[in-house]
Amino acid sequence: MLIAPLGGAEAYMAYVSNEKDNTVSVIDLDKLAVVRTYPVGQRPRGITMTKDGKFVLLCASDDDTVQVIDAKTDKVVRTLPSGPDPELFVLHPSGNPLYVANEDDNLVTVVDVETEKVLAEIPVGVEPEGMGISPDGKIIVNTSETTNMVHFIDEKTHEITANVLVDSRPRFAEFTADGKQLWVTSEVGGTTNVIDPATHQILKRITFQIPNVQAEAIQPVGVRVSKDGKYAYIALGPANRIAVVNARTFEVEKYLLVGQRVWQLAFTPDEKYLVTTNGNSNDVSIIDVAKQEVIKSITTGRLPWGVTISKD
């Protein structure tokens, strides 16, 4: 049992999927160190926690399944029917169901986490990847990489209610905490579009310029917006930077240098830290959110892809 640090702060654990090693690294964010690593299915990518924090959900992409892992024992206890090549997913705010992007079949699969049954298969664009859900759970969003669209899906009917064209290869979708904005990154387009979910209009198209970094190396992927709506943090892939964006003015305020090919990112629940996965340098970066600076690099397995964080 880990003892909380002085001052009564909770200890958080980060779970990192290592795509090339077929493992998950567990990082104690009090010690800022990997405390254990365990084997999982083939090509692990998307990763999240169940609402109660008891289980890790993991896309084992080459096994065509979602694995359910006991967070205490690190053992796979069951699998969920995900459809082929699951890459990213999003869990309903209530904890059930799970919405899974199936890249090979151009579908979003809706899975009941408790009964392990497929509730629906929703046809979307070509190469679906990014998944988002509104805070009230009423709107599900999928991005299709080849169609270059954001698909808005009704929770009850599982029907697409709107399609929004964005820049090339949209990778990730993140609602703000108030549900009034949707941030969508476009990897090849090199941009991030902020969309009004109510009107489906693009509010702002954010571009990035980094001194001494070629434009084609700036490839936005993961994005997270702080709960207070003040800042967005965007992973810029081979540019090896996190863009810190003022979420009210949409201006880029700074770039934080992290590891190589930064891909995904996650806040600790208290938003003290932001953890980034850096695929080509086989590590994660720990960002002090208040100071907006990188304080630590931690070696993981090979090709760290996704990250999720919960209380220990």
Task: Go through the PLM ranges and name each one.
Residues 1-312:
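Predominantly soluble domains enriched in secretory-pathway, periplasmic, or organellar proteins
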